[in-house]
A protein has these predicted regions:
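A short, hydrophobic beta-strand/beta-hairpin element that forms part of a small beta-sheet core
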Residues: 114-128
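Phenylalanine-focused residue identity feature
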Residues: 46, 105-108, 116, 141
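Alpha-helix boundary/capping residues
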Residues: 112, 120, 157-160
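Envelope-exposed proteins and targeting segments
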Residues: 41-43, 66, 94-96, 112-115
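Non-globular targeting/processing and membrane-anchoring segments
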Residues: 1-44, 48-90, 127-178
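Solvent-exposed loop/turn segments at secondary-structure junctions
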Residues: 76-78, 104-106, 122-124
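Thioredoxin-like thiol-disulfide oxidoreductase module
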Residues: 88, 92-113
């Protein structure tokens, strides 16, 4: 029996997106805060790349300053390459973590973008697996939807749920200090 020859490996051009590495979860976008393997942050901003550019830029800047994660439901035009290219352009030199997590939209009952979610305990952060309709309990997180700034959303959440102040406080401090 003869071994099947392996095709030659073609190294990606410098600056090109290595889809193979991306699929293995080992891609590191330049200047993007990698969320892979890190403990989940309590603060997530659910966005769509079809939102107005000015809103996306503001939220990306605020996510970088606060340490929030940008969450996408899926791919732009069903293309990982297009999605990564748009996200790289949006993030630029800022260090921002972002994930594609369609289940998080269900887990936190997100129906529009942007939606801001602040989890109040580790159980809500660690939730994995399938859920059909809002499997995070309402007591485990607070959220707000609307085209507003991150600091406004956090302040609104604290006014509605004073118990969220301890979790929201450090994020608000980082936003106000710069």
């Amino acid at each position: 029996s003869q071994a099947i020859p392996q095709p030659p490996r073609v190294e990606p051009r410098r600056g090109a997106i290595d889809i193979e590495a991306l699929a293995r979860g080992k891609v590191h976008l330049p200047n993007a805060g990698a969320a892979s393997g890190a403990a989940p942050t309590p603060l997530r901003i659910f966005i769509t790349l079809d939102m107005p550019r000015a809103s996306l830029q503001l939220l990306t800047d605020q996510a970088a300053r606060a340490g929030a994660v940008l969450v996408l439901r899926g791919l732009k035009s069903q293309s990982m390459r297009q999605t990564v290219a748009v996200v790289q352009e949006l993030i630029g030199k800022r260090r921002v973590a972002w994930v594609i997590d369609p289940e998080a939209f269900t887990r936190f009952t997100v129906r529009q973008a942007p939606t801001f979610v602040l989890t109040l305990n580790d159980a809500a952060n660690d939730m994995q697996g399938n859920c059909r309709a809002g499997c995070a309990t309402p007591a485990s997180f607070v959220s707000m939807a609307g085209d507003v700034s991150l600091d406004y959303a956090l302040e609104h959440m604290v006014r509605r749920h004073p118990g969220a102040a301890a979790v929201a406080g450090p994020y608000l401090s980082r936003l106000r200090s710069r």
